[in-house]
Amino acid sequence: VLQRDPRLFEQVDQFTLMGGSYRSHGNCSPVAEYNFWCDPDAAKVVFDLMPVPIQMVGLDVTRNIVLTPSLLTYIKDVNPAMGAFIEKITKFYFDFHWEYERVIGCVINDPLAVAGMLDPTILSGFEC
């Protein structure tokens, strides 16, 4: 879309993405973050052509937000249906983060980027 008609983004004042990392190890190789690793050419196009500022929420940020087993239990107590849903969709990630990173919990990657887009006050950063 950016290559075909960048004017589509003229009504947007910021673009938020979850991808990459700054001073952190990768999640699909020792150095690569999965989204950028899958399609580095697309990532380059976004950074080269995006006509508005990009808010990049990388692994170095998302690794600070962990859904712990105790927090998941609390969510299930407060809202059983929502808790069961969250448990179902995060099971893989709980297992992955324990096996590969020895993190007890589920690192919240994409939802943090969405939350930061909806409420920019929850994230801070620097311009590069």
Which residues fall in each region the model found?
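N-terminal acidic, glycine/proline-rich low-complexity segments
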Residues: 1-128
